[in-house]
Amino acid sequence: MSLGIGIIGAGGRMGRMLIEVVHRQPGVHVAAATDRTGGEAVGRDAGELAGQGSLGVPIGDDIPAAVAASDAVIDFSLPEATETVAAACAEAGRPLVLGTTGLGETQREAVHRLAEQVAVMHAANYSTGVTLLTALVEQAARAIGVYSDIEIIEAHHRHKVDAPSGTALRLGEAVADALGRDLSQCAVYGREGHTGERDPQTIGFETIRAGDIVGDHTVLFGGDGERVELTHKASSRTTFASGAVRAAAWVVEQPPGLYDMRDMIGV
């Protein structure tokens, strides 16, 4: 039986890519799609919006109705919608794949409450390559982190509105956790002017916004006489959309709880 997927934020870049990937992938179909009230995508056919021809699925702005019409929900919209999506998933008993980054405290709490009732996958990045990178970064941090200056460099397209990226922050958390540090206390975001010598306990973040870069992330471990750089470069958003669709098929089989991509691929 085909799995019906509801796509929240269908009018955005990732939303359109999700429609395309779901349409092309066997075993799943677009059951419902929403965009923000007043958005240009509302009222259009989801398939036509994504360049896939008519799917007979109009894009609406009623999140609870879209969630109820779906077997699983994928949300790549904005943090402002997260609490509404979580409440709708709780009411309908639908598992959620959440790709929204930049969540505030109340939004994170809503996600955690939802995970007590249904399976929730929340990841900053749905690429299997980035998931593997995170595991490798943890290993490197445990092996050489205490002897290294650690910097995280990320690059994205000019339209990205948050910095550092959610993926960069997750990589920073992986390093900090491996070293027993608190990222909120040791992170340094950019440098300017007379900064003095580098504090060896810090984890640095550098951000690049330019052109149409899909997403590059490098974690650099700098030691005396050598350095190790672990890098992932995405060339297409398809990798993120495909990972999210695989996650949706996975979460419907899981008990209630909060999961990430590492749970799914086993690293």
From Swiss-Prot:
InterPro entries xrefs: DapB_C (IPR022663), DapB_N (IPR000846), DapB_N_CS (IPR022664), DHDPR_bac (IPR023940), NAD(P)-bd_dom_sf (IPR036291)
Binding-site list for NAD(+): 9-14, 35, 99-101, 123-126
Listed CDD domains: DHDPR_N
GO cellular component: cytosol
Keywords: Amino-acid biosynthesis, Cytoplasm, Diaminopimelate biosynthesis, Lysine biosynthesis, NAD, NADP, Oxidoreductase
Pathway linked to the protein: Amino-acid biosynthesis; L-lysine biosynthesis via DAP pathway; (S)-tetrahydrodipicolinate from L-aspartate: step 4/4
GO terms of molecular function: 4-hydroxy-tetrahydrodipicolinate reductase; NAD binding; NADP binding; oxidoreductase activity, acting on CH or CH2 groups, NAD or NADP as acceptor
Entry protein name: 4-hydroxy-tetrahydrodipicolinate reductase
Phylogenetic lineage: Bacteria, Pseudomonadati, Pseudomonadota, Gammaproteobacteria, Chromatiales
Protein encoded by which gene: dapB
